[in-house]
């Protein structure tokens, strides 16, 4: 991937503090807004331990994330409690003790136009 495209994606991921997570699986199609924080190209979300999203992720790790500024497709991984030594501000959110950390490894990001509708640019983050 070109350095400028990677940097553009990293900058876009840093902006939102919340993102809508969309999953599908045995619990059906699920969409919910959760707190998030990025480290480099990895995006971390706090998802309640009782969420149907986690059940879906156990069966299918493909996810889509949405914010006002971008749409992202990627692979999610549930990080078991106590396993991570990440220093995330996200872990200090109110109610974080009732949540599980989910890491999303992005495959593709579509940055939206600031005015109007549609996408301004698409960045492929993985080459398959």
Enumerate the language-model features and the residues they cover:
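Charged, amphipathic alpha-helical segments
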Residues: 2-6, 47, 85
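Short, structured beta-strand-loop surface elements
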Residues: 50-117
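Intrinsically disordered, low-complexity segments enriched in polar/charged residues with Gly/Pro
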Residues: 6-10, 21-24, 50-51, 96-98
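Short, cationic low-complexity segments
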Residues: 97, 123-128
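Short, flexible, glycine/charge-rich loop motifs used to bind or transfer phosphoryl groups or to couple energy/partner
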Residues: 8-9, 33, 92
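Short beta-strand segments
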Residues: 16-49, 55-57, 63-67
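Extreme N-terminal tail/first-helix region
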Residues: 1-19, 123
